[in-house]
């Protein structure tokens, strides 16, 4: 057992109002510069729909994530090393700018400088890539906002698999939900494995996946390898870039920008302890529907004395262990099993989790339109199809989704009886296996959580930071190893980050 810590995130889709504040603030902070105009580290999609970039969930087209070979071993869906080398100069599975959108701005100065005329002046769109005027805007990062466009195009959503989707094109059967997306900072990231330069690495102290800009050579294999399409190519610098989980803020014990500015307060940040030695076995599970449970098995109980003892031996600081014990992510994903991972069938073991939406369900239940199954309404006949949510969050297995929805309904039933009727009705809680204490804690975290409840982020230990002196003036001509001053041989498929050599320790003091 090798214990590591990971900062994870939970997004409560039941409370997302689709305001895009998280997207705009992230854009202003990280990608409001030349070369990254089309990139959105955080974006909010309306589901059902093909998303951004177009049809990103279609891995038969984009070849992202992992596949399990006959011998039980994992391999990137793109292929083995020889196949990657064969595509390195012409990758047929790379999204083009039309799969994203051509970024644009408007000629606002024309509104001020236009000469007097019989017609009102207009601000025409202008491409931010070519600088030329655009005849027509044909796409955007939220092009399908609030079910924009005809159902025929939105019906290409991969989450409609194994469903009779034609009926959902009728107005009376239509449904909608918001899905905020960012880099998943996976436990088993496919982008790390597919980078020919070994430029992508996962930090041991918090699990954040980053791209070393010194080592990146712009091969763009990582863009194809990432099944969530959350790596973007900076055409100005020739490097790939991605969500950095606001690690400068995380190191200071602060939440990410998207979490800090979220209007609906849907985001939760916390630490999870996991067994790094169990990742390969979990990701190699034969049945895709078992991947969710196998990922849960990787996580460890931070209150277990044996886990605490081993974590301290493995170098996990005491402050991180204490933060893991108070983690809202652990409570929602492990204790209550409300939060579910996004597309676990990609076998990357994602670390951004989602609480399935309940608002349309509850409104229908209140209107008396649903049959009941015991105390709770029959959640299998609700407006948002359970199978759709299962295809999105649990590789098609409806049981975890049903349990999460029933537990949220049970908590609301219990609190309504307590608040409105003044009685303690635990029948609904008993039906879904919850105690009164768990229901009260769920209510506190889901409804009235304070800032310190939603964000439990331990600050980094500065005493463990390496010295920056070796980096100073140390970038000469290099190939593969970047500017890290490494004396190791070049390795095209370098799987680990090369640390800098502290030259100060080799310098003898003057007599």
Language-model segments: what does each one mean?
Residues 1-511:
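Non-ligating segments of multi-cofactor redox enzymes
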């Amino acid at each position: 057992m090798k214990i590591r810590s990971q900062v994870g995130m939970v997004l409560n889709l039941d409370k997302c109002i689709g305001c895009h504040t998280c997207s705009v603030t992230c854009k202003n902070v990280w990608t409001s510069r030349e070369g990254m105009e089309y990139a959105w580290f955080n974006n909010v999609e309306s589901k059902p729909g093909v998303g951004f970039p177009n049809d990103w969930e279609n891995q038969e087209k984009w070849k992202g994530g992992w596949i399990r070979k006959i011998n039980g071993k994992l391999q990137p869906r793109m292929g083995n090393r020889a196949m990657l080398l064969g595509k390195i100069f012409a990758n047929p599975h790379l999204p083009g700018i039309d799969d994203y959108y051509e970024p644009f701005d408007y000629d606002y100065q024309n509104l001020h400088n236009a000469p007097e005329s019989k017609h009102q002046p207009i601000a025409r769109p202008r491409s931010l890539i070519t600088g030329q005027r655009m005849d027509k805007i044909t796409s955007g990062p939220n092009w399908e906002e609030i079910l924009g466009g005809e159902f025929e195009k939105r019906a290409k959503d991969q989450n409609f698999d194994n469903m009779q989707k034609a009926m959902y094109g009728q107005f009376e059967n239509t449904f909608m939900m918001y899905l905020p997306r960012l880099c998943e900072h996976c436990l088993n990231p496919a982008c790390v494995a597919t980078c020919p330069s070994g430029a992508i690495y996962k930090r041991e102290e918090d699990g954040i996946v980053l791209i070393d800009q010194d080592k990146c050579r712009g091969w763009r294999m990582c863009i194809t390898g990432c099944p969530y399409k959350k790596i973007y190519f900076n055409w100005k610098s020739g490097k790939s870039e991605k969500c950095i989980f606001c690690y400068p803020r995380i190191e200071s014990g602060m939440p990410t920008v998207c979490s800090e500015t979220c209007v609906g307060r849907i985001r939760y940040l916390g630490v999870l302890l996991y067994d790094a030695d169990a990742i390969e076995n979990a990701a190699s599970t034969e049945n895709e529907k078992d991947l969710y449970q196998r990922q849960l098995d990787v996580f460890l109980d931070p209150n277990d004395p044996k886990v605490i003892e081993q974590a301290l031996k493995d170098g996990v600081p005491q402050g991180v262990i204490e933060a893991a014990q108070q983690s809202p992510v652990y409570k929602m994903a492990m204790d209550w099993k409300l939060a579910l991972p996004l597309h676990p069938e990609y076998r990357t073991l994602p670390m951004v989790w989602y609480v399935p939406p309940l608002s349309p369900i509850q409104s229908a239940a209140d209107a008396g339109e649903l049959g009941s199954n015991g105390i709770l309404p029959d959640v299998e006949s609700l407006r948002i199809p359970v199978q759709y949510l299962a295809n999105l969050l649990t590789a098609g297995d409806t049981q975890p989704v049903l349990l999460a929805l029933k537990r949220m309904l049970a908590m609301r039933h219990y609190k309504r009886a307590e608040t409105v009727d003044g009685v303690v009705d635990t029948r609904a809680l008993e039906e879904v296996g919850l105690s009164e204490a768990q229901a009260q804690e769920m209510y506190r975290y889901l409804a009235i959580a304070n800032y310190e409840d939603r964000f439990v982020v331990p600050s980094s230990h500065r005493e463990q930071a390496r010295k920056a002196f070796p980096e100073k003036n140390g970038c000469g001509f290099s190939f593969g190893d970047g500017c890290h001053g490494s004396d190791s041989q070049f390795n095209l498929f370098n799987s680990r980050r090369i640390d800098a050599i502290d030259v100060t320790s080799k310098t003898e003091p003057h007599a």
